């Protein structure tokens, strides 16, 4: 309802919704056992693509949303608060199997053993807050300043799995009570300052240079727990300045190609990262990287938290300065509006983990995958309305 006579509260709205949604996977691959893109003597050929599961069902999502929107002083200040809870049942996941259970050879001659099944349940819940304000409000030609901010939290939990068992991958696991995309890795303990050997923590929390004794641990999720944005606009006599920022906190990112970026002397094939030059020597005992050893066998580059980084970031997505020519100058022309502008996109990003080299605002699975940041672009232009 809108309170036209109320000078303080101009808007008060309460909303709630609940539903049931079927969620098909992003493509039909989980539902197929053969593909027909193979070639045999220049003819179309079918080849195995998966293990049959006649009981595979759609995921079912039950979303609950409750919101409150408020406006004050004729909407000079607006506040929105919403709670969401989304429960997903019958999650579709590709689980590994032994080749004795269900192995098949794909078109590349690689033996695969996995099967898509409905493995369990997951919840996503959190709070979304939006605040908007017309901080300084004058006539269109006067000085005006407005700003908007939004903040969201996310609590993701896997609540039920097939037979209650962990599903462990090369770098991650699914476990009841943990978030999806949880990293499960040996914990890196740095470099032995006496010998330059790589170190990890064993199951008793002691330092070891034997990778086979290193204990895997839950080391965070690829999902951000806090994210949002901020935008603002200042204008005066046709001149406007617009800025937009975004941010994300609480997630981890894994560089699965770190073994090639930090070769530690293993081979000369790849140039690697520049920071690998900070390696152990008797004169540099507190180096970040182990002593270089050609054709090394100690698994210094094996999967571990050595290549796991914090994904926290703040990015200035857009900065735009514009000038709109006054209508009086456009009289007796066919032009209704002319705006001149200079604009920059993705011109600044602050990554809080100084050792991370790639774009922190990336795909949800949390793998760096040599991902380059969005290009910085600068443009000068004219918008014309007839």
List each language-model region with its residue ranges:
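Surface-exposed, extracytoplasmic segments of Gram-negative outer-membrane nutrient-acquisition systems
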Residues: 41-48, 84-119, 148, 155-223, ...
């Amino acid at each position: 309802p809108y309170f036209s006579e109320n000078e303080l509260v101009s808007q008060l709205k309460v909303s709630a919704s609940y539903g049931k949604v079927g969620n098909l996977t992003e493509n039909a691959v989980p539902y197929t056992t053969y593909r027909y893109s193979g070639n045999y003597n220049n003819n179309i050929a079918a080849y195995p693509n998966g293990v049959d599961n006649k009981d595979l069902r759609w995921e079912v999502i039950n979303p609950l949303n409750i919101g409150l929107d408020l406006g004050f002083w004729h909407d000079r200040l607006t506040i929105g608060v919403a709670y969401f809870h989304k429960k997903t049942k019958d999650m579709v996941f590709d689980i590994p199997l032994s080749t004795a259970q269900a192995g098949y050879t794909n078109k590349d001659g690689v033996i695969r053993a996995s099967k898509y099944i409905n493995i369990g349940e997951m919840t996503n819940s959190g709070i979304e807050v939006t605040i908007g304000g017309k901080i300084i409000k004058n006539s269109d030609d006067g000085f005006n300043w407005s700003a908007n901010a939004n903040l969201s939290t996310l609590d993701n939990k896997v609540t039920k799995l097939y037979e209650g068992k962990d599903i462990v991958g090369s770098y991650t696991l699914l476990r009841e009570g943990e978030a999806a995309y949880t990293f499960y890795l040996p914990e890196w303990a740095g470099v032995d300052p006496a010998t330059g050997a790589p170190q990890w923590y064993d199951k008793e929390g002691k330092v070891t240079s034997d990778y086979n004794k290193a204990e895997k641990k839950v080391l965070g999720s690829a999902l951000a727990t806090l994210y949002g944005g901020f935008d603002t606009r200042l204008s005066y006599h046709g001149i406007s300045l617009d800025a937009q920022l975004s941010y994300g906190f609480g997630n981890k990112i894994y560089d699965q190609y770190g073994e090639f970026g930090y070769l530690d002397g293993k081979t000369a094939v790849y140039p690697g990262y520049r920071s690998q030059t900070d390696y152990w020597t008797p004169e540099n005992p507190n180096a970040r990287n182990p002593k270089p050893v050609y054709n090394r066998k100690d698994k210094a580059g094996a999967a571990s938290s050595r290549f796991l980084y914090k994904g926290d970031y703040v990015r200035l997505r857009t900065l735009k300065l514009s000038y709109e020519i006054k209508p009086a100058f456009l009289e007796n022309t066919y032009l209704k509006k002319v705006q001149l502008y200079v604009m920059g996109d993705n011109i600044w990003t602050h990554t809080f983990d100084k050792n991370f080299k790639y774009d922190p605002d990336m795909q949800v699975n949390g793998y760096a995958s040599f991902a380059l940041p969005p290009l910085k672009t600068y443009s000068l232009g004219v918008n014309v309305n007839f």
